[in-house]
From Swiss-Prot:
List of catalytic residues: 20 (proton acceptor)
EC number: 4.1.3.39
GO biological process: catabolic process; L-leucine biosynthetic process
Protein name: 4-hydroxy-2-oxovalerate aldolase 2
Length: 348
């Protein structure tokens, strides 16, 4: 398909999804320098919150170095052209968090639910529209629903007031044909004025290919992260996406060279470990497991002696979804007991 001249909005995830591999411990200085670099490079929309969205600070998800208010209050006044977004998961974030974000100057709110649970987003989407915010519905783990099922969920979000709906490959499981089937169906079903977005992860190295497939299907908003900093093997790498789009004639408004410098000079140096496709993040994509489970599974491996890969495969078999982080430990304990029992039988 010829995409020459097509315009898209690239939406940066470095300071939100990138909080997962940073264990939510980014400093305010790191936030400032990266946000300003992205802004100067021409990135139009930058997400800033705890990795699990507004209100994510908890025992279950992890305590951040600073509050959402501090992060947002630090970044927003510095932006010269970029707008700032925030993620909100109903049940974690509340309407009070939403109002706080609006007061601080957040432009875009993304209300995220599991891909079969759009009905829990009504209160938050309706309020965001009432507050005249750019309001996005965000359907996570989209590989776990059929194209027809996603159409029903997307239309619910649209009916509540979302002016954009995202199909989100939280596990990095989808292949380009999966993306085309789902986004194509949703694009056909939504009103022409309702935007379509795609959020990818790079666990099967499909981030770029899937994003381009999404654009082919009519997506106008594409998520990516500088140097791919995000859960699992990371998000679609922003600097690569921008370069590919430039080659294809897709207009992003982002400077090809400046965005490379942000990745190389600002983001890579703050990584606690390389964001790459290792056996555990590859397992996330292969088994269709929620990306932010990775570090939890690695911690459980250290604690219970069960390989993270085994834990992740079992989580995938059980169909665990975002929000069930407590079940990772439970699963590891169950597998450890099974291993011990098997070892005893062999010894006997």
């Amino acid at each position: 398909m010829n995409l020459q001249g097509k315009k898209i909005t690239v939406h940066d995830m470095t300071l939100r999804d990138g909080m997962h591999p940073k264990r939510h411990l980014m400093t305010l200085e790191q936030m400032k320098s990266i946000a300003c670099g992205l802004d100067a490079a021409g990135v139009p929309l930058i997400e800033v919150t705890h990795g699990d969205g507004l209100g994510g600070s908890s025992v279950n998800y992890g305590f951040p170095a600073h509050s959402d208010e501090e992060y947002l209050g630090t970044v927003i006044p510095l932006m010269k052209q970029a707008k700032v977004s925030a993620l909100l998961l109903p049940g974690i974030g509340t309407v009070d968090h939403l109002k706080m974000a609006k007061e601080l100057g957040v432009h875009t709110i993304r209300v995220a639910t599991h891909c079969t649970e759009a009905d829990v987003s009504e209160q938050h989407i309706a309020l965001a529209r009432k507050l005249e915010m750019d309001t996005v519905g965000f359907l996570m783990m989209a590989h776990m629903n059929s194209p027809e099922g996603l159409v029903r969920q997307a239309k619910l979000m649209e009916s509540y007031g979302a002016n954009c709906v995202y199909i989100t490959d939280s596990a990095g499981y989808m292949l380009p044909d999966d993306v085309r089937a789902r986004l194509g169906a949703v694009r056909d079903a939504l009103k022409p004025e309702t935007e379509l977005g795609f959020h990818g992860h790079h666990n099967l190295a499909m981030g770029i290919a899937n994003s381009i497939a999404a654009v082919e299907c009519g997506a106008t908003r594409i998520d990516a992260a500088s140097a791919g900093l995000g859960a699992g093997a990371g998000n679609t790498p922003m600097e690569v996406l921008v370069a590919v789009c430039d080659r294809m004639g897709i207009q992003t408004g982002v400077d090809v060279w400046a965005i490379q410098d942000v990745a190389e000079d600002l983001v890579v140096p703050i990584m606690d470990f390389p964001i790459r496709i290792d056996r555990d993040s590859l397992t996330l994509g292969y088994a269709g497991v929620y990306g932010s489970f990775l570090l939890f599974a690695k911690r459980a491996e250290q604690k219970y002696g069960v390989p993270a890969r085994e834990i992740l495969v079992e989580l995938g078999r059980r169909g665990m979804v975002g929000g069930q982080e407590d079940m990772i430990e439970d699963t590891a304990i169950t597998l450890a007991k099974a291993r011990a029992s098997k070892a005893q039988k062999v010894a006997a």
